[in-house]
Amino acid sequence: MRAAATYWCEHYFNTDEYLKIDGRPVVDIYTGYELKAKFGEAEARSFLEAAQDCARKAGFPGIHFVAQRANFDPALAAELASLGFERLSVYKYLSDAARDGRWTSPRDFGQVVATSLAHWRYVHGTSPVKFFPSLSTGYDPRPWIGAVNNVIVTNVTSRGFRRICEDARRFSDETGERYLLMGPLDEWGEGSIGYPNRQHGFGMLEAVRDMFGEKPAAGWPVNIAPEDVGLKCPRRKGLQLRPTR
């Protein structure tokens, strides 16, 4: 962990665009809860403490560690806090069914839209640490791993995502939480896409812009795609959706 933290300090933390909270670089560890499962509580805690020490020696006030997981569990959140994590995040929110362990599939995106705000309020009221609300862009992992034992979110729309952004702004105003995650942006093989694409155009980015940005007096810049300037988007031949197994 010291080697990893040293690399972070030398190559990432000192860049202007790197996210910092109270001056501390943010490190979001995917499936952070597995540190304890794989190495034990004492070793997991020592990993994070070693990274904190490296960051302080490099001139930073420390690291703001975030543990990412698939859903929220208050008891597990308390365990993560005891290891040294200060915040939680969810890779993608897939509706209240996921919270209760009801992994029904397929699942309509409308269900995700309708329950996001209530979920954020639930986590905010029960978590022993802060969290990053996840603004879900959908989920369909069939191109990567097929359909067996996976949740598939259907009928994803930029209009629905705009409603999620509106609720996120409402939640931020209610709680004072200033940090939100849009996620994912570019998981093309998992159907979680916020970047411009043929299905939604610029719709999802426009929703974020309109809800959280400050419109210039001259209006928003014109959206330009590669084809607008005579460029073709590269395409890989032979890609096709895996059949349902």
Residue locations for each model-derived region?
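Glycan-processing catalytic domains of CAZymes
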Residues: 1-245
